[in-house]
Amino acid sequence: MELPFAESWKIKMVEPIHKSTREQREQWLKEAHYNVFQLTADKVYIDLLTDSGTGAMSDRQWSALMMGDESYAGASSFLKLKETITKITGFDYILPTHQGRAAENVLFSYLVKQGDIVPGNSHFDTTKGHIESRHATALDCTVDIAKDTQAEYPFKGNVDIKKLEKALEENKDKIPFIIITITNNTAGGQPVSMANLREVRELADKYKKPVLFDSARFAENAYFIKVREEGYANKTIKEICLEMFKYADGMTMSAKKDGLVNIGGFIATRLKEWYEGAKSYCIMYEGYLTYGGMAGRDMSALAAGLEENTEFEMLETRIKQVEYLAKRLDEYGIPYQRPAGGHAIFLDARKILTHVPAEEFPAQTLTVELYLEAGIRGVEIGYILADRDPVTRENRFGGLDLLRLAIPRRVYTDNHMNVVAVALKNVFDRREKITRGVKITWEAEIMRHFTVQLERLQ
């Protein structure tokens, strides 16, 4: 008999979590204006808000933390981090930042100007925010099949080459670069194939445009290439990473995901022009060039985390837990973006809460219902996150409306996933009775989902 799968690590430290009553949760959520971002962590039983900075570090990372060099300039921790990044990506020029959105802010301050158009595959919230706040346009060129949540397609994160070429033909002088998000978070944590990365590079070369990767989950993307794309089964994750980054000119990185740390990020590039152009913004916004807003100890932990998370066993353990939750949802017939993504399950709220109109935000309503059911915090990746059109100020209802359940790395067991699955089943079983959603009572002009205030409709 074949041995069953088991995690590639063992647990060394634990943290207690506590259940609450539905009555308590109703009061807490009302006080939070039905925005789960406004809940304090002690009011959450299983926290699937994000996998960003919420994972558990290894003993090797903790030991690296203690060896951090806190020198203001030229710290050995930075040199080790730089060496590790270059080994994995092939990029020689590195600017550390305190997290991913800071990397975008620094680099986009140099690259993006008013009137620009930045095509890519489903820019995530901060990426789109940094583009639109500079009065530029984030143009989504994701493949159409990504919108069909029930279609089984291995690389739903891909760029639609025809859409991209049309954008390049029509707006050549307005495009500073092409951006590819790996994996494609907004489309459901879906990967981009190596063949697609290669095609984008060829098109970029044809139109003489640089390519930037939003690389928060690059290692998960490499895992999917290994297990799903022909010709890569016998390659190591590190070999696949080097080939992926061969098709880019640079990357921004939130190290809080595939770097396995609680804080940190960086810019890496092969273009000296980008490095020189972004340097002054790094110093102005983040800090000196060899720490960029990160403590030396965090850079040391990040270097160790990047090494760990570009090994197959670590990624296999992580992604199989996501797949486990997906299989439980399949047992109950609950629709989600298929196949399961690398870091999260994305529930298709429009297919679950069929009686809640788009104008009442079904995915946010589902987020509310799941928290009330079991104290589980997910996050809406849908119509609220999409923000209003910067020109017309109308809500954007054209994309998917999803509830994301992002699973922190090395934190929860499959028993926790069973609780999540049954809680969702309970909500799913009463879906016909959920006919009203929520309305916005206050919102910020941009990236409103973090602070929006809502009212529950009866």
Curated annotation (Swiss-Prot):
This entry's Gene Ontology molecular function terms read: carbon-carbon lyase activity; lyase activity
UniProt keywords, alphabetically = Lyase, Pyridoxal phosphate
For the keyword Lyase, the answer is yes
Q: Per its UniProt entry, what is the enzyme's top EC class, as one word?
A: lyase
Keyword Ubl conjugation on this protein?
no
* UniProt-listed InterPro entries: ArAA_b-elim_lyase/Thr_aldolase, Beta-eliminating_lyase, PyrdxlP-dep_Trfase, PyrdxlP-dep_Trfase_major, PyrdxlP-dep_Trfase_small, Tryptophanase_CS
N6-(pyridoxal phosphate)lysine-modified residues are: K257
GO biological process terms, alphabetically, are: aromatic amino acid metabolic process
Family, per the entry?
Answer: Belongs to the beta-eliminating lyase family.
Protein known as: Probable beta-eliminating lyase
